[in-house]
């Protein structure tokens, strides 16, 4: 019986047997769809605001890093909870799984207090660092105060989504994002422009629509969590904060917070370098909204590729592991090539969606073409980073993330702005991405001579 079970087992898991391209697409498409919805959330706000007032668009471009920081804290902590809950469920330790989920909701309060204080006291100084234009500062204050002071909805929604995912439920978290995004898209024009019974509220209206979308997403998630989910139960009845549970959550969660915060720090740095031109700051803001449509599918792809590489590494199937890496890179490059072609062929139309002024158009068109040269090397770099995570080389993936988004790009951008002017800053993107890819290839070659070399031995 034992032998029979062993002979059957390899056929049970599709990750070891299914044709590779089909397997990658099957595992990646739900994540790609989910990530694209998140990208849509960001872009819709900006399109409506840009068509309402160019100063409003500049203000929300400057506000964007703080929104990213909020998501980094919320999602990073939630990743820690997800890891803890899924491990305890695997161990059949349901009491600790429930306790972990309850701790997760309590950490939402910690995170919320941080961003409530930022919303109340830090918004004006933050906006004033970048611009003396009072209209932009005031729009930024309106937008950020609402988004940060009501961030509890977003923080709880992200936590509950990740907790549901820990139980293997991928569909409802995706639906909650979709529901929130649709509500946001409906209320954005109504509240910004004042359509029908709604007053014209401009940038403030965009903030309210965003928060209302997050509130609806949170309510949807909580309803599923409390009424449709039988795996994990939250109870505050005899709840006590447990230091070792919190430690287990943050051991995984804190590095994830750091990884996700890097992008926020990078944009704050680039905004400071570009501060000599409001139009350049706006162009960077528009670029980041649009590039999320290209990068988010790639991040969705890596969520599908990671377990495939990890599984085949564990099963010592070197050929399949390399096949997953190769096909992952090819699919990633195809996604990024489409993005590059669009940035080269229709930059004017892309910028015009945001109601771009002539000034923004003059800076934005060449900027988009230059920056998009980084897309294809970035695709390969992202999949290599996924490989390092999948085979347990987390430090290499952390080094890669730091290099891509901080260590290389900011010094290069600063030097280019000093030697030439702010219009040369855009070249920092492809230069940094190219060197990051070289580093990734060096790491990979090192692994092929070390850890991966021994994978053949058991097969033969």
Provide a role label for each language-model segment.
Residues 1-28, 85-152, 198-254, 309-374, ...:
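Short alpha-helical transmembrane segments in multi-pass integral membrane proteins
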Residues 17, 21-40, 44, 66-73, ...:
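Residue-level signal for short hydrophobic patches within transmembrane helices
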Residues 26-45, 146, 180, 213-217, ...:
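Transmembrane helical elements of multi-pass membrane transporters/channels
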Residues 36, 40-58, 127-134, 190-201, ...:
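Helix-terminus/linker motif at the lipid-water interface of multi-pass membrane proteins
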Residues 57-117, 154-173, 283-347, 378-400:
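Small-residue-rich hydrophobic transmembrane alpha-helices
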Residues 69-72, 184-189, 218-222, 293-296, ...:
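Hydrophobic transmembrane alpha-helices of multi-pass small-molecule transporters
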Residues 78, 82, 147-165, 173-181, ...:
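Short runs within selected transmembrane alpha-helices of multi-pass transporters and secretion channels
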Residues 119, 162, 188, 192, ...:
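Structural signal for membrane-spanning alpha-helices in multi-pass inner-membrane proteins
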């Amino acid at each position: 019986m034992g032998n029979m079970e062993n002979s059957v087992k390899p056929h049970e898991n599709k990750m070891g047997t299914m044709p590779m391209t089909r397997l990658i697409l099957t595992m990646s498409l739900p994540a790609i769809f989910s990530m694209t919805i998140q990208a849509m959330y960001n872009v819709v706000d900006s399109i409506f605001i840009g068509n309402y007032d160019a100063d409003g668009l500049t203000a929300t471009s400057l506000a964007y890093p703080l929104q990213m920081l909020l998501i980094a804290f919320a999602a990073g902590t939630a990743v820690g909870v997800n890891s803890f809950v899924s491990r305890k469920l695997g161990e059949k330790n349901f009491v600790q799984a429930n306790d972990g989920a309850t701790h997760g909701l309590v950490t939402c309060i910690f995170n919320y207090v941080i961003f409530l204080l930022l919303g109340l006291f830090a918004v004006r100084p933050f906006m004033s660092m970048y611009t003396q234009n009072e209209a932009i500062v005031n729009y930024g204050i309106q937008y950020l105060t609402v988004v940060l002071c009501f961030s509890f909805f977003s923080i709880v929604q992200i936590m509950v989504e990740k907790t549901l995912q820990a139980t293997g439920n991928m569909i409802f978290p995706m639906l909650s994002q979709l529901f929130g995004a649709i509500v946001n898209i409906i209320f954005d024009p109504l509240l910004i422009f004042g359509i029908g019974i709604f007053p014209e509220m401009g940038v403030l209206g965009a903030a309210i629509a965003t928060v209302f979308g997050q509130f609806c997403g949170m309510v949807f998630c909580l309803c599923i969590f409390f009424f449709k989910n039988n795996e994990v139960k939250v109870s505050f009845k005899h709840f006590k904060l447990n230091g070792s549970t919190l430690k287990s959550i943050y051991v995984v969660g804190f590095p994830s917070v750091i990884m996700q915060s890097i992008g926020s720090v990078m944009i704050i740095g680039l905004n400071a370098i570009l501060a000599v031109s409001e139009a350049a700051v706006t162009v960077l803001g528009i670029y980041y909204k649009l590039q999320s449509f290209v990068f988010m599918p790639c991040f969705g792809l890596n969520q599908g590729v990671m377990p495939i590489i990890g599984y085949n590494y564990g099963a010592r199937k070197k050929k399949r592991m390399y096949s997953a890496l190769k096909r992952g890179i090819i699919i990633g490059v195809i996604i990024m090539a489409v993005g590059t072609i669009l940035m080269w062929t229709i930059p004017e139309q892309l910028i015009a969606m945001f109601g771009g002024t002539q000034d923004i158009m003059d800076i934005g068109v060449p900027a988009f073409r230059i920056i998009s040269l980084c897309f294809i090397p970035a695709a390969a770099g992202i999949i290599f980073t996924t490989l390092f995570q999948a085979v347990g080389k987390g430090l290499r993936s952390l080094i890669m993330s730091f290099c891509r988004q901080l260590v290389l790009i900011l010094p290069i951008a600063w030097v280019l702005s000093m030697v030439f002017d702010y219009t040369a800053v855009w070249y920092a993107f492809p230069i940094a991405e190219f060197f990051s890819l070289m580093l990734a290839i060096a790491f990979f070659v090192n692994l092929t001579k070390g850890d991966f070399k021994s994978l053949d031995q058991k097969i033969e």
